[in-house]
Amino acid sequence: MGPKLLESRLCLLLLLGLVLMLASCLGQTPSQWFAIQHINNNANLQCNVEMQRINRFRRTCKGLNTFLHTSFANAVGVCGNPSGLCSDNISRNCHNSSSRVRITVCNITSRRRTPYTQCRYQPRRSLEYYTVACNPRTPQDSPMYPVVPVHLDGTF
């Protein structure tokens, strides 16, 4: 049992490393990619328009995406809240917001195989708390923030 758990943790860490490396290959730091995917102060955003930007980077239709209607600085502030276990049940760098924010969840309505330039989405808007995973900033990030959000772990 012990070796299997260790192997699965190593695989998860390798997968996380690959995701972070992919974000870097796209010319973005993990925190910059987090901001592109999840931070948008326009509470009336149009999912079809905003998701085009994300899908252009990915070159595929993303099935679901959550936008937080808050500032990046406010999301960074959440990194100062007590840390806890992330949804992967392994990482312990997740932090819950202390107040609810407006969110928009964009859910794909077109087929996933649709060309990424033609994806269509349905919005769902609500007011929720959120959880972010935070890491020390990279050298390419602003020195203003020593710790930055790199992953939206969920909303509640």
Swiss-Prot record:
One biological-process term from Gene Ontology? chemotaxis
Q: What is its main location?
A: cytoplasm
Gene Ontology MF term list: endonuclease activity; nucleic acid binding
Compartment(s) where it occurs, according to its Swiss-Prot or TrEMBL record: Cytoplasmic granule
What InterPro entries is this protein classified in? Answer: RNaseA, RNaseA-like_dom_sf, RNaseA_AS, RNaseA_domain
Instruction: Offer one Pfam family short name for this entry.
Output: RnaseA
The disulfide bonds in this chain are: C47-C106, C61-C119, C79-C134, C86-C94
The EC number on file is 3.1.27.-
Entry keyword Transcription: no
Residues of the signal peptide: 1-25
- What residues bind substrate, as annotated? K62, G63, L64, N65, T66
List the active site.
Answer: H38, H151
Relay the domain remarks. Answer: The N-terminal region is necessary for mediating chemotactic activity.
Q: What does this protein do?
A: Cytotoxin and helminthotoxin with ribonuclease activity. Selectively chemotactic for dendritic cells. Possesses a wide variety of biological activities.
What is the recorded name of this protein?
Eosinophil cationic protein 2
The organism is Mus musculus (Mouse)
